[in-house]
Amino acid sequence: MKHRGQEEMGVESTATSDEVVKVPANGNKLEGKNHKQKKLLPTNTPGDVSRVWKIEDSEALYRIEGWGQPYFSINAAGHVTVSPKGDRGGSLDLFELVNALKQRSLGLPLLIRFSDILEDRIERLNACFAKAIARYNYPGVYRGVFPVKCNQQRHLIEDLVRFGRPHQFGLEAGSKPELMIALALLDTPGSLLICNGYKDREYVETAMLSQRLGQTPIIVLEQVEEVDLVIAASHQLGIKPILGVRAKLSTQGMGRWGTSTGDRAKFGLTIPEIIQAVDKLRDADLLDSLQLMHFHIGSQISAINVIKDAIQEASRIYVELASLGANMKYLDVGGGLGVDYDGSQTNFYASKNYNMQNYANDIVAELKDTCAEKQIPVPTLISESGRAIASHQSVLIFDVLSTSDVPRDNPEPPKEGESPVINYLWETYQSINKENYQEFYHDATQFKEEAISRFNLGILRLRERAKAERLYWACCQKILDIIRQHDYVPDELEDLEKIMASIYYINLSVFQSAPDCWAIDQLFPIMPIHRLDEEPTQRGILADLTCDSDGKIDRFIDLRDVKSVLELHPFQPGEPYYMGMFLNGAYQEIMGNLHNLFGDTNAVHIQLTPKGYQIEHVVKGDTMSEVVSYVQYDSEDMVENIRQRCERALEEKRITLAESQRLLQTYEQSLRRYTYLNS
């Protein structure tokens, strides 16, 4: 269950409000899940006409105002809209946009990147730090950097450098390939290039030599061995580098990435190792090159108190380094600025109990006080906020191909001569009511198991087993209809909603497009992008195209807990049913894999214009020919193999000439097409 923070707070706004706490209108904190009971998803019964479903109901159900503000909302037509510039105006109907893109031969699944959202996120982050600096009279500046590892796509990095230029926004590289990207693209005067990750001689020399190009690379020492490497390279090249040290804080993070700190963290120097590095640099006459202190307490920090504790410890280390003679100028607070994926504004791992302004305020205030106490000049502040910048700009659109439902028809009464177990199930079904539903659920389950046992012994015929199972599902549906009207139900019936859920088969690979859903149970907001003026009467889970039982999504955002099913509309064959996965712009694309050889999806970059929008870039998804080449197949050789087999089959009269030509043509065309299904 979610462990709620002690504070509720408002969503971020362009004004970057100083308000920290926002209590619900009733004055009460949100209640967590009862240890013994859980509230099920409410639904109107088919005969319930007491109220009409409204747009506001969909807004509340999918929590779009919680996680989507100020970019996503629902319009009067029941479609999701996107406001790429936030509350500064201009919006697009996402459903209409998808249809327009499909008419341009951009098939689903489709990744839509909104360049204006990326720009708005950079503006907001810089505005928050500017406001904090002004509020606390901080005599320093903020210089953000974007960690390239969050999303290495060329068009995104190019946009980020362009949008960040007014703020001297820089880049952070965590590997040699990322360093190559950053060196080639970052041309903003005064911006910083933070060089993290494991380093060899080539990495260090390349970073140092880039100083000659007018760039400001800061080589962050993360392993003790790197100190000697940097000293040797500096002496050989005759270049005095700008150095930093990454400290392993004792402050413990929280959530999935909480182990990024501490003595056994993967990266960084312990306090004794930092002293060792300082002594070595002093002996090499390079102590004045040590100008930056860096720490990272993990990605997606959900609780503001963790940030408060970390900056308190880090600021003390910073002033001590300055007192040891280092030429300290920069403090890099790393990443961790969270994204509210579930809209609950709590310290749950998929949320955060603070906003961007709270984050900036606490960093600036603590650092100013510590430096003033020790009479040390304040540093230039740096953050590596990748997730908070990149997540919102990307929306993954996919369609539903079909559904699989448990039988919901009214069951037939038993016929004379049928197995007694069928009569027992029928009597159970007839007798279920609000008083006995729990007891009769046990009975129905027992009778179903008995029917399977009789079938395995050869006593029950196949048709009888089918009838028994239909009666069992009818009992479950009747019980579910009852408990949906209750506030809470017993633990043993909690899974009934999921047991009765439909399976919605989606045109998507979870492993390719949302690997964190599979790998670490990450929650992303998922919802239909149209029909939101209709009540979603179905409950479902999502199953992808891969031949893998893990290729599914059965965990969804909720205010009080994680839902095991998602409210969906009845699927209408022949009619499109589009769904969107939101806030997935960080890490997912680069971490996606080729399971079952489903490749990269189509991607399009959209920018708002006074008259609507323009398509800046189209990045076509992988074709079948491309994905097979990744595993060392040559498509021309494959076509030739099929051609030769067709010729042999013709010779042996196992295929007609027309059939062979049709097969060959289809085979060649398929290799040139998208790896996903035509919708």
Curated annotation (Swiss-Prot):
Binding site for substrate: 331-341
Top-level class of the enzyme under EC nomenclature: lyase
Keywords for this protein: Decarboxylase, Lyase, Magnesium, Metal-binding, Polyamine biosynthesis, Pyridoxal phosphate, Spermidine biosynthesis
Keyword check for Calcium: no
Region described as Disordered: spans on this chain: 1-43
Cofactor dependency: Mg(2+); pyridoxal 5'-phosphate
Biological process, per Gene Ontology: arginine catabolic process; spermidine biosynthetic process
Signal peptide: none
Catalytic reaction list: L-arginine + H(+) = agmatine + CO2
InterPro entries: Ala_racemase/Decarboxylase_C, Arg_decarb_HB, Arg_decarbox_C, Arg_decrbxlase, De-COase2_CS, De-COase2_N, De-COase2_pyr-phos_BS, Orn/DAP/Arg_de-COase
Sites of N6-(pyridoxal phosphate)lysine modification: 149
Stored PROSITE patterns: ODR_DC_2_1, ODR_DC_2_2
EC identifiers of the protein: 4.1.1.19
Family as reported in the entry's similarity comment: Belongs to the Orn/Lys/Arg decarboxylase class-II family. SpeA subfamily.
Functional description taken from the UniProt entry: Catalyzes the biosynthesis of agmatine from arginine.
Protein name per its UniProtKB record: Biosynthetic arginine decarboxylase
Annotated gene: speA
